[in-house]
Regions:
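Positively charged, solvent-exposed patches that mediate nucleic-acid binding
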Residues: 1-118
C-alpha cells in the first residue's frame, strides 16, 4: 500500500516527477479558470484515482503566499473531490490567486474544471 503523506493524500495521488509534469503540459488540454489554469491529460494507468500536481510561480508572491495557495488548493480538493480517475492534472495558480484567502474562493473554478473532466 502506498505510504501516506500529510493531509491524507497518498503519494500515488500526486505528480512527483518532472517527466509527469512535462507530459501533462505537452499532451494535455487547458482549462482556464479565473484564479487557476488546469492542464489535464488522460492517463488510464493511475489506478482508482487521478493524480495532481500544483504549480505556483514566483510572480504570484513570496514563499509564504505560494505555500498558502498550495495548501488551500490541496485542502479544497481533499474535501470536495479529488481528480477523477484516469486523469493527471496540474493546477497552475494565476496572479489573482494571491488575493484568495479561503479554500472556497477557488470553488467556482475548481468545480467547473472537475465537471469538465468527469
Amino acid at each position: 500500500m502506498p505510504r501516506r503523506t500529510s493531509f491524507g493524500i497518498l503519494k500515488a495521488m500526486r505528480l512527483r516527477q518532472r517527466v509527469d509534469y512535462v507530459a501533462v503540459q505537452s499532451d494535455g488540454m487547458k482549462l482556464h479558470g479565473r484564479h487557476v489554469l488546469a492542464l489535464a491529460r488522460r492517463h488510464p494507468g493511475t489506478g482508482p484515482h487521478g493524480r495532481l500536481g500544483l504549480t505556483v510561480t514566483k510572480k504570484v508572491g513570496n514563499a509564504v503566499v505560494r505555500n498558502r495557495i498550495k495548501r488551500l488548493l490541496r485542502e479544497w480538493l481533499r474535501l470536495h473531490g479529488w481528480v477523477p480517475a484516469g486523469w493527471d492534472m496540474v493546477l497552475v495558480a494565476k496572479d489573482s490567486a494571491a488575493r484568495q484567502l479561503h479554500p472556497d474562493d477557488f470553488a467556482p473554478d475548481l468545480l467547473r474544471i472537475l465537471r469538465q473532466l468527469s
